[in-house]
């Protein structure tokens, strides 16, 4: 596309959540409720892990990091959506859009890595219980956390810097409720080959590789559990993994839903809704999954609530 069709972009336009201003209270209330539930739920998980010494283990330390990441990922997208709904203004500045792209990549990448590390933790606990304290020592799982942070941050910075090199056309309407790197790249007039290569590479590193690791870990766990002689041992092992398996299924299920909707949906609004659900629903449901299905977490939460509201 020729230079005459390019322009210096100062802002992008996001998709309207609703076309009717009189109905804006409905989506605003929905997003606000989901956001508050996500923040409060994950904040309770953070406080429970900090306050209860029985939860100072690798598994709950990883859950602590996952809950913190959930708060950050949701906060990256939902507040801007709420502002746009209330103001009936769909614009987002160029700098704001790049910042949102970078933060979404950081926290989505972290979430994927943490889920893989948690699967490995369950694999070691069930398949190698006698060596658990040796294999999952504080230095090793601390290193895994730092490595996850480094990889996701570097990926986000590289992809954001490559977006900075792009020239954009006059059409700067993003068919989503927030800035997402793939959709922003589609608006560029300049060559996007390197950007697309980076996206495919990142999808492998933060999608296919963690997913393969999780599937391998659970295949080994299932094999090990089936060899257990007692039904009680099998139940305990499966219940230990149940929470993580539910969270993993929800996260990758919504991610797969985004991919399918973008590939087959005729309406861009369907893809937009699927994308925002990916950054909200798993993060909102994680605290409920862990608080309802994990006995130790339920006990810690009851103690915490008793301290916060002693009446």
Swiss-Prot record:
The lineage of its organism: Eukaryota, Metazoa, Chordata, Craniata, Vertebrata. Belongs to the G-protein coupled receptor 1 family. InterPro entries: GPCR_Rhodpsn, GPCR_Rhodpsn_7TM, Olfact_rcpt. It is found in: Cell membrane. It comes from the Eukaryota. Residues 1-29, 79-97, 155-196, 266-269 are extracellular. Residues 51-57, 119-133, 218-244, 291-311 are cytoplasmic. Disulfide bonds join 97-179. Its main location: membrane. This is Olfactory receptor 7G1. Glycans are attached at residues 5, 89. Pfam families: 7tm_4. The gene is OR7G1. PROSITE patterns: G_PROTEIN_RECEP_F1_1, G_PROTEIN_RECEP_F1_2. Keywords: Cell membrane, Disulfide bond, G-protein coupled receptor, Glycoprotein, Membrane, Olfaction, Receptor, Sensory transduction, Transducer, Transmembrane, Transmembrane helix. CDD domains: 7tmA_OR7-like. Odorant receptor. It comes from Homo sapiens. The chain crosses the membrane at residues 30-50, 58-78, 98-118, 134-154, 197-217, 245-265, 270-290. PANTHER family: OLFACTORY RECEPTOR.
